[in-house]
């Protein structure tokens, strides 16, 4: 596992900037998501709480992969959960967040559509979390589509 130590200012800037819209993360760059969508075959929907929503964090995590890296990232609203502080420190010194059940709450999140290599890399960077399948959820993507099953990394709170 690669350690992602940073400066105190890096830790304090958590959860890092997000584009505020759905996008394609392509080799460290943010690009517009095609109106025609993308091919979901072979991809797993993973909800991002905290820094995994940020293209800056995705760049840090995925720069170790060889070849072309392309991750569709969709902005959505997750119902019945909130994003709260986790009970541990990240490797770079910030207090990260995790999803926690919260009826009547809606939180903005991003859905990362990861292929197998990207998912394996994400597992390597999320060792303080459990990888959970969330069923019967409601993620309204870009105000239209509803996703009812996805995965998330959950931490002790």
Protein language model regions, located:
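Glycine-aromatic micro-motifs
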Residues: 1-157
């Amino acid at each position: 596992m690669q350690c992602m130590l940073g400066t105190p200012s890096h830790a304090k800037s958590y959860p890092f900037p997000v584009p505020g819209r759905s996008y394609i993360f392509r080799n460290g760059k943010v690009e517009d998501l095609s109106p025609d969508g993308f091919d979901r075959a072979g991809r797993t929907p993973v909800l991002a709480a905290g820094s995994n929503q940020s293209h800056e964090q995705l760049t840090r995590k995925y720069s170790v992969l060889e070849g072309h890296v392309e991750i569709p990232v969709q902005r959505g609203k997750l119902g019945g959960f909130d994003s709260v502080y986790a009970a541990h420190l990240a490797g770079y010194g910030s207090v990260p967040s995790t999803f926690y059940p919260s009826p009547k709450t809606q939180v903005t999140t991003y859905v990362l559509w990861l292929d197998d290599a990207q998912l394996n890399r994400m597992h390597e960077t999320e060792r303080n979390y459990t990888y959970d399948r969330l069923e019967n959820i409601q993620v309204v993507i870009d105000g239209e589509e509803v996703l009812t099953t996805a995965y998330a990394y959950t931490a002790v709170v």
